Amino acid sequence: GNFKGKHRVLGVTPEKIGKIAIKKGIPTIIDYFNKRISSKIIKKYGKAKIITATNVFAHIDDINNIVKSIKQTLKEDGVFISESHYLLPLIQTVQYDTIYHEHLRYYSLESLNFLLKKHKLEIFDVKEISTHGGSIRVYASRKGKYKISQRVKKQFKKEKKHLNKKSFEKFKKNVISSKINLFNLIKKIKDKNKNIFGVGAPSRASTLINYLGLDQDIIDCVLEINGSYKIGNYIPGTKIPILDERILSNKMPDFLILFSWHIKDELKKNLKKKGFKGKFIIPLPYPRIET
């Protein structure tokens, strides 16, 4: 919606969020993007100057046909901008909690380059961003259309240094020690008869809870913001209930474990505003207690 009013925009998504976009006045096709939809778009709207795909690639099975359709929909001098959860911060900050069935793959600049090159698209700029605990934004076009930024070369160099067999072996060790340290931290708290609520029920919470073997005797419940469709359900694989965070007004735990730890500063600020006076457990990149 940021471009609306300045440019002609069009969204494509198979999800319910598309209906919200339509209500907000953003033209949206509620369907999966593919060759058929691409042809439909070209016929009705013409080709696009800019195409964006935000956190999309990791969820798509037939990725090559998608890239083919993206290229088909792009103008000759068009730019394709994609954002993907980035492999480099994932292993550096021990984000094992984000490895789950919904994510089919994790991207580096090297792998994105390999994919786009196959379809004669060239990466001419790159940027690391903070989304999802660390993502990579790449700008691509048909070969030779734009000058290649020095940032691309620098990023390849950085990956060569930090993404290798050694780094993955280190990641494996860090995952195991992180699990043990977090479990011991929680055990010490429970040994003192303190109670713990969780905050946020993203998929990563389910991965972490099940990997550690936590249950409702350890985590009383997980809180979600009022209106979340997850309220009234349970964390998969457990009997830990997901409740409305408004229960904090009459039931205050000693500790809150922040499952969306990558936005901990924002969460802590909001929870303190709502009157929480206890302590926070930050599970990753290294387990610790914060006030």
Task: Describe the residue ranges of each PLM region.
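Short, glycine-/aromatic-enriched active-site segment of Class I SAM-dependent methyltransferases
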Residues: 80-105, 109-111
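Conserved SAM-binding loop of SAM-dependent methyltransferases across substrates and taxa
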Residues: 1-6
